[in-house]
């Protein structure tokens, strides 16, 4: 196929594309059959035009739009609530008789939070609170009560209400997990016996 009068353009693969396109027009599915329009369609179609843009993803369900109509970073208060929720849930799941490593992990978790917490002034305050009130993680009850006490120390400094720590298990009790699957120690069974 001779080059077009206007030249090959700037794409170095353009001659190859034109040659392959011309060759594919001449291929027949069944060479001994009479040519018809369907059989003369190219088996291969190459184009130098950009690929079509993929369809845009479907919009989120309406309940997602209603729930969070603002697309903004979390506030300091929202991060605080989420952090306390996580910590109280961890304390509620903490073993009644933790291993030395689990007690160490509880202390280290609090130390890490005091270093990495996304609110600098909150992290500094939490370091002070931890220094004055070292982590108590000898059992689930002790860890939960200590965390409730520390949470109340923070709440007092913010002028927020104090939570009655005798109700901590009613508020943050163990997760409802079948066959103790929420236990930190878990079980050695890969598949539970039925």
UniProtKB/Swiss-Prot annotation:
Function: FAD-dependent sulfhydryl oxidase that catalyzes disulfide bond formation. Oxidizes thioredoxin in vitro. Required for the import and folding of small cysteine-containing proteins in the mitochondrial intermembrane space, and can act independently of the oxidoreductase MIA40. Can oxidize the cytochrome c oxidase assembly protein COX19, a typical substrate of MIA40.
PTM annotation, UniProt: Contains three disulfide bonds; one catalytic disulfide (Cys-119 to Cys-122), one structural disulfide (Cys-148 to Cys-165), and one shuttle disulfide (Cys-177 to Cys-182).
Pfam families: Evr1_Alr (PF04777)
Keyword Cell division: no
Disulfide bonds: 119-122, 148-165, 177-182
Listed EC numbers: 1.8.3.2
Keywords: Disulfide bond, FAD, Flavoprotein, Mitochondrion, Oxidoreductase
Self-association and partners: Homodimer.
Name of the protein this chain belongs to: FAD-linked sulfhydryl oxidase ERV1
Source organism: Oryza sativa subsp. japonica
Keyword Oxidoreductase on entry: yes
Coiled coil: none
Biased composition (Pro residues): 49-63
Signal peptide: none
């Amino acid at each position: 196929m001779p080059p077009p009068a206007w030249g090959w353009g700037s794409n170095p693969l353009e001659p190859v594309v034109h040659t392959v396109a011309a060759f594919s027009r001449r291929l027949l599915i069944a060479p001994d059959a009479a040519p018809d329009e369907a059989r003369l369609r190219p088996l291969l179609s190459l184009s130098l035009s950009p690929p079509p843009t993929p369809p845009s993803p479907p919009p989120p369900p309406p309940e997602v739009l209603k729930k969070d109509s603002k697309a903004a970073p979390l506030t300091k208060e929202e991060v605080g609530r989420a952090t306390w929720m996580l910590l109280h849930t961890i304390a509620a799941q903490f073993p009644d008789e933790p291993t030395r490593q689990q007690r160490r992990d509880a202390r280290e978790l609090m130390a890490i939070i005091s270093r990495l917490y996304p609110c600098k002034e909150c992290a500094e305050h939490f370091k002070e609170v931890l220094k004055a009130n070292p982590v108590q993680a000898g059992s689930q009850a002790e860890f939960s009560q200590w965390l409730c006490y520390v949470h109340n120390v923070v709440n007092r400094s913010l002028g927020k209400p104090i939570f009655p720590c005798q109700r901590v298990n009613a508020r943050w009790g163990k997760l409802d997990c079948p066959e103790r699957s929420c236990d930190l120690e878990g079980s050695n069974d890969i598949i539970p016996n039925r």
